[in-house]
Amino acid sequence: MKKHLNTLFVTTQGSYLSKEGECVLISIDRVEKTRIPLHMLNGIVCFGQVSCSPFLLGHCAQLGVAVTFLTEHGRFLCQMQGPVKGNILLRRAQYRMADNYDQTATLARLFVIGKIGNARVTLARALRDHPEKTDGEKLKNAQHVLAGCIRRLQEATDQELIRGIEGEAAKAYFSVFDECITADDPAFRFEGRSRRPPLDRVNCLLSFVYTLMTHDIRSALESCGLDPAAGFLHKDRPGRPSLALDMLEEFRSYIGDRLVLSLINRGQIHAKDFDISETGAVAMKDDARKTLITAYQQRKQEEIEHPFVGEKMAVGLLWHMQAMLLARYIRGDIDMYPPFVWR
């Protein structure tokens, strides 16, 4: 399976993207900064005051390269892409499944099992790697709660019950997340999840990396012919990529949380890399965004053996593989969708 894993993230304010030959040309104040072959990209993400020429947008549409626009701090604005790929029969099957209560509950349960399973492994890794810097009792207790949530999910058929168990697991996980942060800087203490806006540096990093992952997962779903807006765990809402958010749950901890923990614990992100507004909202400065994006791209190039398929692949291909497995399940080619659980 050959997929281009490169997403071009443009964060420098005032950048202008244009087409020159088969390359995307990035200029600032009419001065060329770099050029990148378009055939090497699977997406372009523009943050803040970044503009694109109509010719570039048209060519990207022809090549199937989605161009996404976000605010400077990562809030989704819009996405431009060419004709939707995929089999209409697959999408019809997806919509029928999303309208079926029992089938929706089944998939919602599997997404949550994947999420909690990976969260449990993240806590176990923190205890194993840093036993002298963590409260082992707290981490073990949280792992026990998560294991209990997974057992209860095995028999859960009610959608609201499934979401309730997910919330219980998230509360237990984030109640000890601060134990996974081994850096001594008090600026990176974590007291709980906050969003829209994030109210501390750790939440700011988490929200931003989740945004990057959502973009890539959305593209993977579309490349497999699925509609990223028709989800099972997350309810329909205009403009919300519910299915992309469903699949994101499997990868929040394994990719997003561990990446943020690594950057903090290794001292690659510093307290001075953030701005705090009068309202308490926290936002990354440009250097911090670039550091996180670079680390994210590097993480996507690392290899892992897929626990279900049994083949080695780049981390950045995991959501493509999960999207393919989900499409096969919806078509009836396999009996059950196997959520990704890191072992």
UniProtKB/Swiss-Prot annotation:
InterPro entries: Cas1 (IPR050646), CRISPR-assoc_Cas1 (IPR002729), CRISPR-assoc_Cas1_C (IPR042206), CRISPR-assoc_Cas1_DVULG (IPR019856), CRISPR-assoc_Cas1_N (IPR042211). One of its GO terms (molecular function) is DNA endonuclease activity. Keywords: Antiviral defense, DNA-binding, Endonuclease, Hydrolase, Magnesium, Manganese, Metal-binding, Nuclease. Mn(2+) binds at E166, H234, E249. Its EC number is 3.1.-.-. Its cofactor is Mg(2+); Mn(2+). It is an enzyme of class 3 (hydrolase). GO terms for biological process: defense response to virus; maintenance of CRISPR repeat elements. Homodimer, forms a heterotetramer with a Cas2 homodimer. Belongs to the CRISPR-associated endonuclease Cas1 family. CRISPR (clustered regularly interspaced short palindromic repeat), is an adaptive immune system that provides protection against mobile genetic elements (viruses, transposable elements and conjugative plasmids). CRISPR clusters contain spacers, sequences complementary to antecedent mobile elements, and target invading nucleic acids. CRISPR clusters are transcribed and processed into CRISPR RNA (crRNA). Acts as a dsDNA endonuclease. Involved in the integration of spacer DNA into the CRISPR cassette. This is CRISPR-associated endonuclease Cas1 1. It comes from Chlorobaculum tepidum (strain ATCC 49652 / DSM 12025 / NBRC 103806 / TLS) (Chlorobium tepidum).
